[in-house]
Amino acid sequence: METDLLIGTFVNATTNSEYLSPFLLKHPIGGKVSSEVEQVVRQMAKKFELDGYEVSEIAEDPINGIELQKGFYLISGAETVVMFQRMEKQLQRQMTRFDMELMTWVMYQSGLMVTGADYARVAGDWDRYAKAMMQLHDTYDVLLLPTVANTAPKQDAYSLDANLIEKMEHIHELSHEDRQEIVWKMFESSVEDTPFTQRMNITGQPAISLPVGRSQEGMPIGVQLVAAKGREDLLLMIAEQWEQDELWKF
C-alpha cells in the first residue's frame, strides 16, 4: 500500500534539547512514499518528540526535486563526454556504441548536445540549492528523511521496455530536448524509489543512513540524517545515541 504526496514536517527542539531537527517526507519528484517507509520516519520523529522535541509542519520542500534531477542528468552527460574524450585521446580513435553498454551510450550522446550555457545555468542552480539548504540549517541542525521511498525492489523492477530501448539505440538521431527526455525515462522508475539522496551529492552536505525499521516482509527500512557542511559530528552523535537505544535493526 502506498500513500500520496506528503508534506514536510519539522521537529523543533524544546529547552530540553540543544539541537533542532526537521524531518521531510514529501517525494522530491512527485512520486509516492510507501506507507511502511512513512511509518518508520514518523516513528523516529516521534522519538524526537518523546525526547522533548515539538513537532510542526511546513508545506514546501526548499528544493525543486524535478529541476534538480534534470540538471543532474545534464551535468552527468557532459562529464561523460569529457571522460570519453580523454579515452579517445589515449586510444587515438573515436568511441563507438560497441565500446560501452547502452545506458552509458545514452548518457554520452545526451552530453554531446549540452552547451556551455546549459552547464553554467545548472551550476548556478546548484549554488542556489546549496544556499537554500544552508538557510535551512541556519534554523535547524539535522534533517531527518527517508533513505529511499520504498523497500528494496525485485531484480527486474527497473527493466526497460522494448520501445524505450529502441529509442535509446537511436538517440544520436534525436534533438537535445528528446535526448534529455530519453535520459529521464531511462532512470524514471529507479529514481522514483531513490529520490532523497541526490541533493546531498549536489549541495555537499554530510548525510548518514541508519537501519531503524523493517517492513512486514522483513525488508530493511532506513532513515537518513543530514547536517550542514562540516557538521558530521552531529550525525555521528545521533547515530551513536540511537545505537545505544537499540533502535538499529539488522
Annotated model-derived regions:
Residues 212-213, 226:
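Residue-level structural signal for beta-strand termini and adjacent loop
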Residues 219-228, 235-236:
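Short, well-ordered beta-strand elements
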Residues 208-210:
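A short, aliphatic-rich beta-strand micro-motif
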Residues 215-217:
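Flexible loop/coil segments at beta-strand boundaries within sensory signal-transduction domains
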Residues 1-198, 202, 230, 241-250:
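Amidase signature
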